Regions:
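Bacterial N-terminal signal peptides that target proteins for export
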Residues: 1-10
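Repetitive helical segments and hydrophobic/amphipathic motifs
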Residues: 13-14
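C-terminal segment of classical bacterial N-terminal signal peptides
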Residues: 17-25
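Mature catalytic domains of secreted/periplasmic carbohydrate-active enzymes
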Residues: 28-493
Length: 496
């Protein structure tokens, strides 16, 4: 890859004029382009690259709302997420604190971190404070916290930090910018302005505690509120001053974050450049625990396959994937919910290199599924398995030495016709309940061969057909942005 340009707007111009460029120096050109490494590289910024390596984590909404489980005074909450039940059901604070007494009665940080680890996840992101303002750590900023108000009386964030560190699981914090102990509860929209007293009297000291007392924090996930651009910059700066390697999400608002996040439960299957993360809950209607969710055994295989598909679709499209589970009020995870994530963890263990440590590729997404790469291998994730049907991938450079059903000794027939690779599926579906994986092995790292190439010289005009673009996670004034990549015949870098 040798040149990158940002193209903003809904469509690209018919031609791009790249001038002036310093005269590039080329080695002797081969007779045909050999392509570029198929793997989309990690960010060249160390902290971003380290975060991208995490790939897959557990999001966990846990607080006083978990004790309610979506019910108040014997009736099911009629509107809104259950973690916002205090506002939707107009629950008085004194009543709310009565429920807090029962919070985390059976909380076991070791068991939670083990579930995360055994599920193939690399980080745990938990709600340190949701919109209700109830702090889930031992804070000196308010008595409205789990240590002071629950019979549990301990700091679950400290316990999670200790136990997850033992297993190599990174810790991340969700932090709501709004605080219903100081603002009128408004669950209908993201309209709460942030006054200076809240900024300096609550948000700053609470962030200081969270980023000082619990070890390295992989990401700080802000949410809600209507801060000014200056306030957004200050919040991001506070985080970076305390922990320079902590990634800040885009919901700090006003383009002050380090990475983009979409809407709740928004999972894209389209490739996007730039650091980004998708979040999805096991039950899209609730992020905190909802006791009424369908946990019938007949629904389990559907949830497992949905999770696998969302995981593959996100990481193969260049993003991180955080999957949410809401523990019960006592701090335990429902057996159905933990069973879904651990089953997918077993699938990942059967295919240890297909996701973990693998990278998305430059290949345009084929109609039959998704692709990842690691080392000298490509990994195909076909959506369907049908004996005799083929998986065709154009623009493949390099020499294929073997194709097999990943995790087995079953080989598959294949042909290479120029830059077109065709694999024929055969035998029974190796993963009838989840997603099959095909391993394609090369004699060196696989390459992507663009269908159009151009030799770049000063003042060269390059048509839209001669670059390949990938949508950026960033948007500018509501328009989609694109990262455009150009490759010259010799695959040597052009430097400005």
């Amino acid at each position: 890859m040798n040149l990158k340009r940002m193209l903003a707007g809904c469509g690209a111009a018919a031609a791009l004029v790249l001038a002036p460029l310093s005269a590039p120096t080329f080695a002797d050109a081969p007779s045909a382009p050999t392509g570029v490494p198929a793997a989309v590289p990690l960010s060249d910024t160390t902290k971003v690259a380290n975060w991208q390596k995490l790939q897959y984590g557990m999001f966990m909404h846990f607080g006083v709302y978990s004790v309610y489980g979506g019910y108040y005074n014997g009736h099911r909450q009629g509107m809104g997420y259950p973690e916002q039940i205090k506002a939707w059901e107009h629950i008085p604070t004194d009543d709310y604190l009565l429920k807090a007494k029962d919070l985390a009665a059976n909380f076991d940080a070791s068991a939670i971190c083990k579930t995360v680890h055994d599920s193939g996840m690399k980080y745990l992101m938990i709600t340190s404070k949701h919109h209700d303002g109830f702090a889930m750590w031992d804070t000196k900023t308010t008595d409205y916290n789990i240590v002071k108000q629950s019979n549990y009386g301990k700091d679950p964030m400290k316990e999670l930090s200790t136990e997850c560190n033992k297993l190599g699981v990174k810790l991340a914090f969700y932090f709501s910018i709004i605080d219903w102990t100081k603002q009128t509860p408004e669950p209908y929209g993201n309209v709460n302005p942030i006054d200076e007293e809240l900024m300096t009297g609550t948000i700053k000291p609470q962030l200081t505690e969270l980023l000082t007392n619990y070890g390295p924090i992989a990401e700080l996930w802000f949410d809600m509120g209507g801060p000014t651009a200056e306030q957004s910059q200050r919040m991001a700066q506070w985080v970076h001053e305390l922990q320079p390697d902590t990634m800040v999400n885009s919901r700090v608002w006003n383009k002050a974050g380090d990475f983009e996040v979409g809407g709740d439960n928004s999972v894209t299957t389209d490739f996007h450049m730039g650091p980004w993360e998708s979040i999805r809950s096991i039950y899209p209607a609730c992020w905190g625990y909802c006791s009424w969710a369908n946990r019938d055994e007949s629904a389990k295989s559907y949830k497992e396959r949905e999770l696998v598909n969302n995981l593959i679709g996100t990481v193969a499209s260049g993003g991180q994937f955080a999957y949410n589970i809401g523990p019960k009020g006592d701090g335990t995870i429902d057996a159905f919910d933990s069973g879904v994530v651990t089953e997918v963890g077993q699938w990942m263990a059967r295919h240890p290199d297909a996701i973990t440590g693998a990278r998305p590729t430059w290949f345009p997404a084929p109609s039959w599924g998704k692709i990842m790469t690691k080392g000298n291998d490509l990994y195909f994730f076909p959506e369907q398995w049908s004996t005799g049907q083929t998986l065709t991938l154009p623009s493949v450079g390099g020499h294929v030495t073997a194709v097999s059903v990943d995790g087995t000794d079953r080989s598959l027939d294949f042909t290479q016709d120029g830059t077109t690779l065709t694999v024929t599926m055969s035998g029974e579906n190796p993963e009838p309940n989840l997603r099959p994986v095909v391993k394609v092995t090369f004699d060196a790292a696989p390459t992507y061969v663009p269908t159009q190439t151009v030799t770049a010289v000063d003042g060269a005009t390059i048509s839209s057909e001669q670059f390949f673009g990938r949508a950026s996670a960033l948007r500018y004034s509501g328009a989609q942005a694109y990262d455009a990549y150009l490759v010259n015949k010799t695959d040597k870098a052009i430097t400005d």
